[in-house]
Swiss-Prot record:
May be involved in the regulation of cellular senescence through a positive feedback loop with TP53. Is a TP53 downstream target gene that increases the stability of TP53 protein by promoting the ubiquitination and degradation of MDM2. It comes from Rattus norvegicus. Interacts with UBTD1. Residues 149-224 form the Ubiquitin-like domain. SMART domains: UBQ (SM00213). The lineage of its organism: Eukaryota, Metazoa, Chordata, Craniata, Vertebrata. Residues 1-35 are annotated as: Disordered. Residues 24-35 have a biased composition (Basic and acidic residues). It comes from the Eukaryota. This is Ubiquitin domain-containing protein 1.
Amino acid sequence: MGNCVGRQRRERPAAPGHPRKRAGRNEPLKKERLKWKSDYPMTDGQLRSKRDEFWDTAPAFEGRKEIWDALKAAAYAAEANDHELAQAILDGASITLPHGTLCECYDELGNRYQLPIYCLSPPVNLLLEHTEEESLEPPEPTPSVRREFPLKVRLSTGKDVRLSASLPDTVGQLKRQLHSQEGIEPSWQRWFFSGKLLTDRTRLQETKIQKDFVIQVIINQPPPPQD
């Protein structure tokens, strides 16, 4: 778990006007994914709710909003396995990492920012849920009106996969196509574009995706059962 605290309660930052002294060193963001176990099994939806609650309330306590925004973008990029982008965001905002993780960060004024581990990676005991979104999806467009184009998706394993897509396609439909090509269960897939999580009912045309853009797919495969 490295230097990250596995507790799910966020510690209150330093009192306003009294920034904690920044550590003298700055390490690059580590590429390994932090592993942790939740006190109780949670679904993907519950995890998203906890993250939204943190990001919505964190700037109200202490720190600069632009730094919180940069940390949020860097956290999403790192989880999507785009460490180069995450590091560029941190460098651009002059954020230092004494331990090479986003658990403890400092801005150029010496203010400390602490991110809970649930904002950095899903728990190992994340519950896979089958939503009703697939059954609510509108019917697929007829072949006569489909204008297909190659859609590039980058898996969290580092592999790039090209899917045959059209703008009216939903993410749920494309998840099933990725399953047929790579054998990755749709419930294991979490699709991100421009730092936002795409739901199964989201259509490609709603994402404003353009040619040669890449969609990040984080794979949350459940651990093998232990004897």
